[in-house]
Structure formats: structure tokens, C-alpha cells
């Protein structure tokens, strides 16, 4: 039964990833006043399927000087970790209801750094290594603010369990009392998932395509899928944390519909940002985090610690 549950979670995610690639190409196309994919199937709807067949039937090449085992393990690990992060997300019921769901999410996103690092190192190419080092520095840096913002939200929530966030936001979405946190969280998720304007890892002008430059066919597709899985997961997480979806125990379907619409809107905003903004310079990226976000999040964290005490109430213990 548990295996069926896992499959029922993974298969829709992979389908969503496949069609997100199509949505992205369509949205970017229309924003640049062109059509986007429109040949394969009606309105280009079968394009992701054609892409998948092409990628997975090609011969997976690898450089003769690369470290074989690590070269193969890295993309598999990237996708596995990306899918594992969906386990504690309440939609409205999580696959496994963890007491420390948030901590699990943080741990998994930290582990995802290793797959990027290994892929860059195992490729035995300067471009790949520089891309990987950039990605790791960026991910680790932005995780600091993500963790502090999460802590601030959880202080209002009163528990590390993600399911209680639904109860906390029954009357008021957390985006309203903590909108500065939400803004910083959203920008940090962009940086965490290596999306434009923070896609320095794949700076085409200087690094060809970043850490996955030596990958082709199947393994490349796995990295690609991991990236998009992470994008959808981060937006789902943002929805749970700040845009508490409407939950009625008698009609749990309403929650899922509400949750999906909000996640979709956030994902489209990711694409909109990609179409609108140029890439940051590396020092600007680090300056934004260490000089702007970090002091502000620390101050807001202290504010959230003192808030329940000043209002002479303790956080709800669930």
C-alpha cells in the first residue's frame, strides 16, 4: 500500500515537471512575441513527451577522464532528493506526517548541494567545476536566510509540523503579518533553485551551461527534472507557509484545488521573473544576501521571538 502511495505522489510530480517545461517555453515565447512549441501535437502539447523519448533513447556519453561512479550517481541523487522533499508536504495530508517536517526539508535541500558538487567535480572539466562551486556557494548562502525565515514563521506556528500551518492560517494568511519575510523568502527560493535572475551556475556567456556541461541524454534529463521538481516543490512550500490554502475537513478536495492554483500562480511568477530580469553579477548576489537579507531576517527573527511574549501569550503548542 505504501508503495502505491509513493507512486501516486511521484508520478503526478513527474507529469507536472514534464508539462512545466512546456508551459515555460510557451510563456517565454509569448513574452518575446513568438509562438513557442506548436508543431508536435495540438498547440505543442505533446512536445514534452517527444523530448522525453529523444533524451532517454540517446546514448549517454561521458568524458573518458571523468570519475564514472560519481558521474552517474550525481544526477540520480539530485532527482531522488528532489522527490524526497515532497514527502512531508501536507496536500492536505502528507505522505508521512513528520514531527520535524521542516527540519527534514532543510536537511534534504542541504544534501542536494552534494549532487551538484559531485557532478561538477566528476566531470573533470574546468567549466563544470566552476559552475558547481558557484552553485554550492549560492545554495549554501541562501539556505541561511531560508532557515531563519522558516524559524520566524514556526515561532508564529508554534510547532515544527507542517500540517499545523493549515490550522494556524485558518483565519489569516501568514503573508499579511509577515510580508517582508515573504518577499525575502520568495527571492531566496529563486536563488535556492538556481533560477533567473540568479542562474549564475549556468551563465551561458562564460560557463557554457554550468555544472551539467559534460552531461548528455538521460543523466542530463535527470538534472533537468530535478531542477523543475525543486521549483514546483519550493512554490508548494511557499503556499503552505504563507498562503495557507482553505481547508474544510468535510471537503478535502477544496484544499487541493486551492493549493494547486496558488502553487501554479507562484510558478508562473518564476517564469515571468525569468523573462523580465537580467542575470545578477556574482558580487551583487552575495551582497544582496550577506549585507541586506541576513541582517533584516535576524532582526525580524528577534521580533518574532519577542512578539508572543509582549502580547502575553505563548505560541500554540500542538
Swiss-Prot record:
Keyword Mitochondrion: yes
Keyword Kinase assigned: no
GO molecular function: NADH dehydrogenase (ubiquinone) activity
Gene Ontology cellular component list: mitochondrial inner membrane
Assigned EC number: 7.1.1.2
One GO-annotated biological process of the protein: aerobic respiration
Positions of transmembrane segments: 2-22, 70-90, 100-120, 146-166, 171-191, 222-242, 253-273, 294-314
EC class name: translocase
PROSITE patterns (UniProt xref): COMPLEX1_ND1_1 (PS00667), COMPLEX1_ND1_2 (PS00668)
Annotated keywords: Electron transport, Membrane, Mitochondrion, Mitochondrion inner membrane, NAD, Respiratory chain, Translocase, Transmembrane, Transmembrane helix, Transport, Ubiquinone
Compartments it resides in: Mitochondrion inner membrane
Role of this protein: Core subunit of the mitochondrial membrane respiratory chain NADH dehydrogenase (Complex I) that is believed to belong to the minimal assembly required for catalysis. Complex I functions in the transfer of electrons from NADH to the respiratory chain. The immediate electron acceptor for the enzyme is believed to be ubiquinone.
PANTHER family found in the cross-reference section: NADH DEHYDROGENASE SUBUNIT 1, NADH-UBIQUINONE OXIDOREDUCTASE CHAIN 1
Protein name, entry field: NADH-ubiquinone oxidoreductase chain 1
Gene source species: Rhinoceros unicornis (Greater Indian rhinoceros)
Organism taxonomic ancestry: Eukaryota, Metazoa, Chordata, Craniata, Vertebrata
